[in-house]
Amino acid sequence: LYTKPSKQSTTDLNGDNIKDIVIGGGVDSTFCNNSIMAYDGNDGSLLWKRSSRDEVFGSAIFQDLTSDGIDDVFISGRSGQLLAINGLDGSLIWDYFPYNTNPSDSGIYNFYNPQFIGDIDGDSYNDILISNGGDHAAPSFQSNRPPGHLMIISSFTGNLIV
């Protein structure tokens, strides 16, 4: 079952001064080869795509981490996915939870729409405020679910600040 895609976000990823489109999607609780895709805003052709371990539903935000003049992509979703992706070629810069364990076992659940705030850690990059919570694997009748929480993440390293 494919889920509803994230809101389309736009920025120029190929240097042609036309905004390109980044969108997330995927399948709930399933690895997907095409869950993050970037499309050329001029002709609609695929610029790059990335796989993910679970559904990606957060709207992408952009900031140039690689100093190549092209915005890099930050996008989020289920199973502790908060990713920084090279906007030029789609390669992974960092993954907040890159481990081969269930993020829920570590108290990390779904990441929702990231937002940039000021530079909290002094590295000259705007950092990320994001909410995390909502154990989608828990039964609907379970009343004592873990609470969600707000987190501040370094956009440059992907490390937790607060």
Protein language model annotation of sequence segments:
Residues 1-6, 45-53, 91-107, 159-162:
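Aromatic (tryptophan-biased) beta-strands that constitute blades/sheets of beta-rich domains
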Residues 15-24, 67-76, 122-131:
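Acidic/hydrophobic-patterned starts of short beta strands in beta-sheet-rich repeat architectures
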